[in-house]
Amino acid sequence: MNLAEICDNAKKGREYALLGNYDSSMVYYQGVIQQIQRHCQSVRDPAIKGKWQQVRQELLEEYEQVKSIVSTLESFKIDRPPDFPVSCQDEPFRDPAVWPPPVPAEHRAPPQIRRPNREVRPLRKEMAGVGARGPVGRAHPISKSEKPSTSRDKDCRARGRDDKGRKNMQDGASDGEMPKFDGAGYDKDLVEALERDIVSRNPSIHWDDIADLEEAKKLLREAVVLPMWMPDFFKGIRRPWKGVLMVGPPGTGKTMLAKAVATECGTTFFNVSSSTLTSKYRGESEKLVRLLFEMARFYAPTTIFIDEIDSICSRRGTSDEHEASRRVKSELLIQMDGVGGALENDDPSKMVMVLAATNFPWDIDEALRRRLEKRIYIPLPTAKGRAELLKINLREVELDPDIQLEDIAEKIEGYSGADITNVCRDASLMAMRRRINGLGPEEIRALSKEELQMPVTKGDFELALKKIAKSVSAADLEKYEKWMVEFGSA
């Protein structure tokens, strides 16, 4: 980016504004604002980036003032009252003595005459305060014969509130608060929806909350966590992986692994599903994908977890594929290819890591499979893992001294992590069910807390296992293992 060109365009924009050539001035202002925006994306130093954003904000204010001048001049040509002279004297405040004659009392009440005076006066004070910069000094010649409640006044007041909001956002960021993403160019509702429904900071899921899966934890540490701790090492050919695909049966802990990665790295966590990135309006889905990755780069370091990615980016070229679905897939592939993480000259601490999970890896598009460089298998828990899962799920429940969790772990072979959680939940409710059996509503309400806190016994688990069967078949496991032999990259 040529900084001299930025300075030259800003200078020309101000000169044209001072000479009264407002159309050319607005063109130069738009160009320099876009140049600064692109330059800010390439700046890595937060202090320097903040200064550039402050310069861009000042130029935006000047640009808005030029637009206000053009709007005022156009209004003079269209609806200027012919009976009252236009005064060009520059005054910081409006004097009620020089206002046009009041309208008849039957048309407007006196309180309504004075209300615009209270609203317009702070705006003129704000315009006078920033008049020292660039062409803003020419923004003061305003007709005193204007009607106080025109649409132009409302637009000016709205712009003043928006500019004040932007300044408050920047001041908050300088005070150490979380900066807010500037969604210029996007629909405000789309930005707010992604902020509200997707962004999850500090998920608070740690490695200790996940039983077993040591190989998967080791690979995820190497792919995501270690580049944050050792940025100087992971450069060049050792750059971090662009993306990781987690493959396995349902309920094996893929989502929890992604949240643990975000917690251990201290990154912003984006939990994305197919419903998040789809819209009934043409072109909106592609915008959502692009907006998601721009927000991820803004809040970097970031972890984007795309759950059930086969529903978003299934194999292209099939007979039942729709044009809109193909466009979304293409945009997703382009954005993922642009999120290179830490390339040779990039900062690994600003990387965007893409994690994906699927239960149907054989339906994923080949181009997406290439971009997800690491493809790991999340299997069913082993005997040791099942025992750890039982301990984690039952750590808040009182257990009978005679119960042996290792024996129960042997009986639940083939159960997924979610199945084991359901077994523990059902077993912990058995004592309560026996206690309230045959009681009426009033008697149940009268029970004390101590009467319900009965220890979980081995018999409770036996009853729960009779009611809950495993959800993954041997044929499904064979399909996963066959796919990993052909396409796995652990």
Curated annotation (Swiss-Prot):
Keywords: Acetylation, ATP-binding, Cytoplasm, Cytoskeleton, Isomerase, Microtubule, Nucleotide-binding, Phosphoprotein
Gene Ontology CC annotations of this record: centrosome; cytoplasm; cytosol; katanin complex; microtubule; mitochondrion; mitotic spindle; spindle
UniProt modified residues of type Phosphoserine: S174
Listed InterPro entries: AAA+_ATPase, AAA_lid_3, ATPase_AAA_core, ATPase_AAA_CS, KATNA1, KATNA1_MIT, Katnal1_chordates, KTNA1_AAA_dom
One Pfam family cited in the UniProt record for this chain: Vps4_C
Enzyme class: isomerase
Name used for this protein in its record: Katanin p60 ATPase-containing subunit A-like 1
Primary gene name: KATNAL1
